[in-house]
């Protein structure tokens, strides 16, 4: 169930076979999962329920298990660069763990599956999102 979403987007597939779906709304999106049943149908599961991601600023992104997801209202954005950071226990401080360039869809939604080495070895958060236009110019930042 994706609530009153006007658009449903397939984001990716989890390692356990669950399909990850996003239901787009005007001010955010839902993330839910579904598993195949009887060969041709999909059944909603609670295995990867992430609930509602409100986007109250121009651009927002999160790490949902092993997938970066986000939405931007920068209408000229064609890609975003997401800078991830994770907690370093040895240094007792946050450190940058990666920078990922992700294409932006017509609806402003963007997503990317992280490599298992990043997703499984460190607890990541999105430190900064940089929006770029077709010319590669920075047109917005959210940090």
Language model features with spans:
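A mature extracytoplasmic/lumenal domain signature
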Residues: 24, 74, 84-86
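Short beta-strand-to-loop capping motifs
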Residues: 22-24, 72, 113-116
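Long, contiguous interaction/targeting segments characteristic
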Residues: 1-54
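Ser/Thr-rich low-complexity repeats and stalk/linker segments
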Residues: 3-6, 39-40, 51-54, 59-66, ...
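Short edge beta-strand/loop segments characteristic of extracellular beta-sandwich folds
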Residues: 66-74
């Amino acid at each position: 169930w994706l609530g009153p979403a006007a658009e449903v987007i397939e984001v990716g597939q989890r390692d356990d076979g669950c399909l990850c779906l996003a239901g787009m709304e005007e001010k955010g999106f839902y993330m839910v999962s579904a598993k195949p049943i009887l060969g041709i149908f999909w059944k909603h599961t609670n295995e990867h329920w992430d609930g509602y991601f409100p986007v109250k600023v121009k651009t927002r992104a999160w790490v949902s298990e092993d997938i970066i997801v986000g939405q931007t209202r920068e209408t000229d954005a064609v890609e975003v660069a997401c800078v991830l950071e994770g907690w370093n226990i040895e240094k007792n401080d946050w450190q940058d763990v990666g920078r990922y360039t992700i294409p932006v869809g017509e609806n402003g939604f963007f997503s990317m599956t992280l490599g298992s080495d990043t997703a499984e070895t460190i607890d990541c958060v999105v430190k900064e999102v940089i929006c770029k236009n077709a010319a590669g110019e920075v047109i917005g930042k959210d940090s």
